[in-house]
């Protein structure tokens, strides 16, 4: 199966920069702003957005990760749920503006699971959603506030995001 490159390294960098600016505009700066990336690639994108915001405003926004494993509805639930916080960040996110970051928005189920993970232990003032790619085909009424690129796809196509931190290249491809 051949791959079609939709975004190369330069396009991803420009998109991360634009999303960082949009988040700052949305929040009117960095006050009370928290970035939470969904493991795995969303966490790396969150770090990149954090770095861009720091370049723009010279403030390091608190950034963490969300592990949605225990909140997914497509896996058989275990009887003994783990009773520990499913996100990792060094600050309290209650009454903060939390931006959840993912690589690809598809059915909306990953985002729903991330909302469950956050809301189980905290009550943010506001939650926003940023995604590098929105490919459509939603199964839940979820919409991103910050979208890098809308890529209409067929359901049988796969959209893959490759990030240098784990994939040794930066690209968004349709396979």
From Swiss-Prot:
<feature type="binding site">
    <location>
        <begin position="40"/>
        <end position="41"/>
    </location>
    <ligand>
        <name>substrate</name>
    </ligand>
</feature>
<comment type="similarity">
    <text>Belongs to the purine/pyrimidine phosphoribosyltransferase family. PyrR subfamily.</text>
</comment>
<dbReference type="InterPro" id="IPR029057">
    <property type="entry name" value="PRTase-like"/>
</dbReference>
<feature type="binding site">
    <location>
        <position position="159"/>
    </location>
    <ligand>
        <name>substrate</name>
    </ligand>
</feature>
<keyword id="KW-0694">RNA-binding</keyword>
<keyword id="KW-0808">Transferase</keyword>
<keyword id="KW-0805">Transcription regulation</keyword>
<feature type="binding site">
    <location>
        <position position="85"/>
    </location>
    <ligand>
        <name>substrate</name>
    </ligand>
</feature>
<keyword id="KW-0328">Glycosyltransferase</keyword>
<feature type="binding site">
    <location>
        <begin position="102"/>
        <end position="110"/>
    </location>
    <ligand>
        <name>substrate</name>
    </ligand>
</feature>
<dbReference type="GO" id="GO:0006353">
    <property type="term" value="P:DNA-templated transcription termination"/>
</dbReference>
<comment type="function">
    <text>Also displays a weak uracil phosphoribosyltransferase activity which is not physiologically significant.</text>
</comment>
<dbReference type="GO" id="GO:0004845">
    <property type="term" value="F:uracil phosphoribosyltransferase activity"/>
</dbReference>
<dbReference type="Pfam" id="PF00156">
    <property type="entry name" value="Pribosyltran"/>
</dbReference>
<keyword id="KW-0806">Transcription termination</keyword>
<dbReference type="GO" id="GO:0003723">
    <property type="term" value="F:RNA binding"/>
</dbReference>
<dbReference type="InterPro" id="IPR000836">
    <property type="entry name" value="PRibTrfase_dom"/>
</dbReference>
<feature type="binding site">
    <location>
        <position position="135"/>
    </location>
    <ligand>
        <name>substrate</name>
    </ligand>
</feature>
<comment type="function">
    <text>Regulates transcriptional attenuation of the pyrimidine nucleotide (pyr) operon by binding in a uridine-dependent manner to specific sites on pyr mRNA. This disrupts an antiterminator hairpin in the RNA and favors formation of a downstream transcription terminator, leading to a reduced expression of downstream genes.</text>
</comment>
<protein>
    <recommendedName>
        <fullName>Bifunctional protein PyrR</fullName>
        <ecNumber>2.4.2.9</ecNumber>
    </recommendedName>
</protein>
<dbReference type="InterPro" id="IPR050137">
    <property type="entry name" value="PyrR_bifunctional"/>
</dbReference>
<feature type="short sequence motif" description="PRPP-binding">
    <location>
        <begin position="98"/>
        <end position="110"/>
    </location>
</feature>
<comment type="subunit">
    <text>Homodimer and homohexamer; in equilibrium.</text>
</comment>
<keyword id="KW-0804">Transcription</keyword>
<dbReference type="InterPro" id="IPR023050">
    <property type="entry name" value="PyrR"/>
</dbReference>
């Amino acid at each position: 199966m051949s791959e079609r490159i939709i975004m190369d390294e330069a396009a991803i960098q420009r998109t991360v920069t634009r999303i960082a600016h949009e988040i700052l505009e949305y929040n009117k700066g960095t006050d009370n702003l928290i970035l939470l990336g969904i493991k795995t690639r969303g966490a790396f994108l969150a770090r990149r957005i954090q770095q861009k915001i720091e370049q723009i405003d010279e403030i390091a926004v608190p950034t963490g990760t969300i592990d949605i494993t225990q909140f997914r509805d497509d896996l058989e639930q275990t009887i003994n749920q783990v009773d520990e916080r499913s996100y990792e960040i060094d600050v309290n996110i209650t009454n903060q503006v939390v931006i959840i970051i993912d690589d690809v928005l598809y059915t909306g189920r990953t985002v729903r699971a991330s909302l469950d993970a956050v809301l189980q232990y905290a009550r943010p003032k506001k939650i926003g959603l940023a995604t590098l790619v929105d490919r459509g085909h939603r199964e839940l009424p979820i919409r991103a506030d910050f979208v890098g690129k809308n890529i209409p796809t067929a359901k049988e196509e796969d959209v893959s995001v490759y990030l240098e931190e784990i994939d040794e290249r930066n690209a968004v491809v349709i396979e």
